[in-house]
Curated annotation (Swiss-Prot):
This protein's name: Recombination protein RecR
Organism: Anaplasma phagocytophilum (strain HZ)
Zinc finger C4-type: from-to: 53-68
Gene from which this protein is expressed: recR
Described function: May play a role in DNA repair. It seems to be involved in an RecBC-independent recombinational process of DNA repair. It may act with RecF and RecO.
NCBIfam families: recR (TIGR00615)
């Protein structure tokens, strides 16, 4: 692989443009043995050992994942998040001890993303079969996040389960993954029924 192709591949990562990618590639080339080789091996091992959880769609080394198999977690709470980074934000803050469901995105008419493109079809069954008493919809506050929230609420309405949404602390158009722990804690504690 030539250097320019590797720079182009790094540029596809979030937050990295051509200049940052070039600096990273040059650093890797200068530090082949102590940085590049362990990084390449780590990426290869990660690719081989990571599995998508068959229940919540988290990524882990086992399926079901360590969250879904943890007997200390509150199985009556189900927090639905857009992306894996949102789940990790909750876990990092240690502010939530229930179960998760990772959608893999949000509904978006403009982008052509419908319910069949997301991990949505198993939500009603999870709610019915696993003793869920409250579903917390933790999607972003932008239009697509709100539409997704409404769709989820309608899809489980017949179960009679309480459906809540994160409240204060999340700015309009904000992304959960970028919130600090205090803001996320405030939003979780002041969620409201939808």
């Amino acid at each position: 692989m030539d250097i320019s192709r590797l720079i182009s591949l790094f540029s596809k990562l979030p937050g990295l443009g051509p200049a940052s990618s070039r600096r990273i590639v040059l650093h890797l080339l200068r530090h082949r043995h102590d940085v590049m080789t362990p990084l390449a091996n780590g990426i290869r091992e990660l690719e081989e050992s990571t599995k998508e959880c068959e229940i919540c769609f988290n990524l882990d080394v086992t399926s079901p994942c360590s969250i879904c198999t943890d007997s200390r977690r509150d199985k009556s709470l189900l927090c639905i998040v857009e992306e894996l980074g949102d789940l990790w934000a909750f876990e990092k803050g240690r502010i939530y001890q229930g179960m998760y469901h990772v959608l893999g995105g949000v509904l978006s008419a403009l982008s052509g993303v419908g319910p069949e493109d997301l991990n949505m079809s198993s939500i009603p069954e999870r709610v019915r079969l696993h003793g869920v008493k409250e579903v917390i919809v933790a999607t972003g506050s932008d239009m697509d996040g709100q539409v997704t929230c409404h769709y989820i609420a309608q899809s489980i309405k017949s179960t009679g389960v309480k459906v809540t949404r994160l409240a204060c602390g999340i700015p309009l158009g904000g992304e959960i993954d970028y919130l600090d722990e205090g803001t996320l804690r405030a939003a979780l504690s002041s969620r409201y029924i939808i």
